[in-house]
Regions:
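Gly/Pro-rich active-site capping loops and adjacent beta-alpha segments
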Residues: 210
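A conserved active-site cap/scaffold subdomain adjacent to cofactor or substrate pockets
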Residues: 173-181, 192-197, 201-202
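Conserved "HGTGT" condensation-loop signature of ketosynthase/thiolase-family condensing enzymes
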Residues: 1-72, 76-79, 86-172, 190, ...
Length: 256
């Protein structure tokens, strides 16, 4: 393992990671499974927690067929003021980034994501914020690997006290197909309104870690005015990474 830990140690660390997600889900009015679970319950298979595909048990898998919904109204500040909307409800975008990863067979390894690393840099690009300024986080959580990749890309230490979800995550809050992140953003908006002038980070990914997105939100306006960098301008950083050579007829020794 690239972290230098054993299979059992990694299994237990995944259990601890998602146990912390259940603590958030337990307190959520919208979580489909608002139940706090121990690391051991999550890490190891049981009658209630079958092994879906090694090393992931049921409690480590996204529940993405949940009957849920979320909605966000997007408009200009001028329009919102004209409609008489309370300014305390305003949420502003402070950063956004989207990247596309290389095909799976051409990536240099399977334990990190260059596209996610570039996204993590670009979502803060051109502003004064850093990860230290983020009070609330929702890392996309289809499986433990998605959270682990994001934690590495954004430089969040394993012992960082900030929860890595505001919903409880895909296995415990659940999601409506590919619309889970709408629930993440809506939940983030609630947190930011409760703590004005704080900042929240939401990430998303899809496919085989094929595409990534991130946004930073706050009740405060970004000054001076800002416009995002077109993703194609920094996508070239990823596209220019040399592909790993591929053969359909391997021979000789190999390590998996």
């Amino acid at each position: 393992h690239h972290l230098g830990v054993s299979i059992d140690e990694h299994q237990e660390s995944m259990g601890r990671l998602f146990s912390s997600f259940t603590e958030v889900a337990e307190k959520s009015l919208h979580a489909w499974y608002p139940i706090k679970r121990t690391a051991e319950e999550i890490a190891y298979s049981s009658a209630e927690n079958r092994l879906v595909a090694w090393p992931y048990t049921k409690y480590m898998n996204a529940m993405n067929q949940i009957n849920q919904g979320a909605a966000i109204i997007l408009m200009s500040e001028t329009r919102a003021l004209r409609l008489g909307i309370d300014r305390h409800k305003f949420i502003y975008l402070h950063g956004a980034a989207d990247t596309i990863e290389k095909p799976l067979s051409t990536r240099s390894n399977f334990h990190s994501s260059e596209a996610m690393r570039v996204m993590a840099e670009q979502v803060f690009f051109g502003g004064d914020l850093s990860m230290r300024d983020i009070s609330f986080i929702d890392f996309y959580s289809c499986f433990p690997s998605a959270v682990e990749f994001a934690r590495e890309a954004f430089g969040v230490a394993p012992d960082d006290p900030r929860p890595l979800t505001v919903t409880g995550g895909l296995p415990f809050h659940g999601g409506a197909g590919n619309n889970y992140v709408m629930n993440s953003i809506a939940s983030m908006i609630d947190r930011l309104r409760e703590k004005p002038e704080s900042f929240g980070l939401v990430t998303a990914n899809g496919g085989y870690f094929s595409k990534h997105s991130a946004g930073i939100y706050s009740t405060t306006r970004r000054e001076p005015s800002w416009s995002r960098t077109p993703p194609e301008k920094y996508q070239t950083v990823i596209d220019l990474i040399p592909d790993v050579s591929f053969t359909e007829n391997p021979s000789g020794e190999a390590v998996v």
